[in-house]
Amino acid sequence: MSRFVDKLPLFDRRPSPMEEAEGLPRSGYLGQLHHHQYYQPHSNMLPLEQSPPTSTKHTSVTLAQLLKRVNDARSGSSTPISSPRYTIELGGSKPESVSSESDDHHSDDGGSEGQPRALVLKFTDLTYSVKQRRKGSCLPFRRAAADEPELPAMRTLLDGISGEARDGEIMAVLGASGSGKSTLIDALANRIAKESLHGSVTINGESIDSNLLKVISAYVRQEDLLYPMLTVEETLMFAAEFRLPRSLPTREKKKRVKELIDQLGLKRAANTIIGDEGHRGVSGGERRRVSIGVDIIHNPIMLFLDEPTSGLDSTSAFMVVTVLKAIAQSGSVVVMSIHQPSYRILGLLDRLLFLSRGKTVYYGPPSELPPFFLDFGKPIPDNENPTEFALDLIKEMETETEGTKRLAEHNAAWQLKHHGEGRGYGGKPGMSLKEAISASISRGKLVSGATDGTVSVAASDHSAPPPSSSSVSKFVNPFWIEMGVLTRRAFINTKRTPEVFIIRLAAVLVTGFILATIFWRLDESPKGVQERLGFFAIAMSTMYYTCSDALPVFLSERYIFLRETAYNAYRRSSYVLSHTIVGFPSLVVLSFAFALTTFFSVGLAGGVNGFFYFVAIVLASFWAGSGFATFLSGVVTHVMLGFPVVLSTLAYFLLFSGFFINRDRIPRYWLWFHYISLVKYPYEAVMQNEFGDPTRCFVRGVQMFDNTPLAALPAAVKVRVLQSMSASLGVNIGTGTCITTGPDFLKQQAITDFGKWECLWITVAWGFLFRILFYISLLLGSRNKRR
């Protein structure tokens, strides 16, 4: 099998265009993990260049310490730095002599075969099946056609998968699409419900509590779920606020962020926003590394990644895996799925697990791929990437009836022949889980969530009790700190997208201007009364329709929210309240803008008190409308589903508000909808604010004939009709006599069951209710585990 060597010097070399574009360090810990590896057919070691150790003493070091030593060497000495050999272990054996601090680390953790390991993640006979429905059928009772094959009721995604991953190594899960790669990563990361997953997953031979696993591990999704308007440094700093212990000073958190930025090669992009389709930001490779950084901010002991190189070019993909290799060598267990690794990436992987239709078809180091397939009768050509050959062969075998089964049986026989029944590769755990976690903390691992406050950046107190499920709090921060951090982050996002608020304000002002010019200075005639009814109905429904733009807000953040709450970054209640706090000031501005545009122009009554009540009911309408849209955003999963639901529901609310049909004319079987109509209460509130004064008269004398057939009669005839009515009724009715006052008109409209202040508070209560329902929807609908 052919290999190649990158001959570029490690120091004082010119940066490549990709490095200049993505800000990768030219020297330091990551700069020394070079682009090409020399992969020898009869050796399990990868020689790499590295800066010299400052001491020959065997000590475990963290990434931060290595970075500090390199920086100190560069800044504090003018002597040229030599480049001794640095070795990354690929197989189970170790060379006789190595001179690097990584060797010290491996030596401490049991890197050589037979020596104890600090952490061993072992999974045994993992099996997971899901119910399967016939394609194209929405009805479960649909009968199959005669020529249609009967599908099995259950589909097995994982079928007896076993293996182990160790600290200091990267285990890569490979396979074609649908082979079960992501499912296995989810199973190991405890993202599948226990009642659905069969088999066992242990760390150092012990089952682990779910809360403790969330504290010591991280899960990186395939998608880059980041706020586009935050800079790289801000994104990582907010992650530090959520994941690092509250006892850790802010300066230490900032220090950790700076170190992580250097570690990820993001120094040049630190002050660049993430960006999206409408805003230029970091490159795809940098965005991927930021996504990884968000989840490793607390320096997790276990790291699970679902295809971290997906969608990246070869150079960016290699740098991402290089970062993961550095994380593994700092003492973490790294498990990731990957579609098709290149030669260079293969040189960084320690253990491979190939899946085909949920079965294990190869498990072992990359160096054993050639003899494995040679023994199977399919030798790997010398000039071909072993993983590409393996994936192509596996895909070909899947087309055969018993192809996958044959390959899986060959793997089982190979494992039994070369590694025995235990399927182990090298060392076993030399300490208990608690001891291993304590040892990891003492090496500088940042384990978030310890209630005793003993965890810090450079925790070195070996006497401190190890964290356990009982000593680990569910959340790092108390409620009020979560509120502050979430509110601050949301305000930054809002401030950097002013166009969103400007468009909303423009919509309100344009609507108010149109209404003001149409209903300009309404009089107190019967026609003016009818025109007021139309103005109030349109105005109050407009408040709700303009709130529909709140629907995409949470939908755009949904997956970020799911990622952050999967590891208890914050409480759902904190998110709901901070979301409310950030959105409320804009509602106040919109309310005053609409009221100032319409109240005096239309000629509404009430003076100053009436104006401020009008502002209050408009604000309450915005509050209830935004709450309704927010609640729906927690229920629906896509904006294309949400908008039809919002618009149609608001149309029903307007229909049953009492404007088109009075309450006493609504059929009894629809009366319940009248009382849950969001438009009913603000509509009745402004009606009472306008017509509640008994001293105001809206129909006088002959005006009673308006909107009747008698309206066409001459004025003199109308007066004689009034005189005849007066004589008949015994009541003096003249042309100036008040026939209908404001309260009389409210009775005609059946607006009698609630006062105007009651309508105001009911509208406010709707807003609170919908936000409570939004919180409940987050509790019920944000499960991060498969069923």
Curated annotation (Swiss-Prot):
Membrane-spanning intervals of the chain: 500-520, 535-555, 576-596, 599-619, 620-640, 641-661, 728-745, 760-780
Reported tissue expression: Expressed in the crown root primordia, endodermis, pericycle and stele in the root, in leaf primordia of main and axillary shoots, and in the vascular cells and leaf epidermis of older leaves.
Residue span, ABC transmembrane type-2 domain: 484-691
Organism for this UniProt entry: Oryza sativa subsp. japonica (Rice)
UniProt: ATP binding residues: 175-182
One GO cellular component term: plasma membrane
Biological processes, Gene Ontology terms: cellular response to hypoxia; cellular response to osmotic stress; cellular response to salt stress; positive regulation of response to salt stress; potassium ion homeostasis; regulation of secondary shoot formation; response to abscisic acid; response to auxin
Annotated stretches, region: Disordered: 1-25, 71-116
Xref: SUPFAM superfamilies: P-loop containing nucleoside triphosphate hydrolases
Name used for this protein in its record: ABC transporter G family member 5
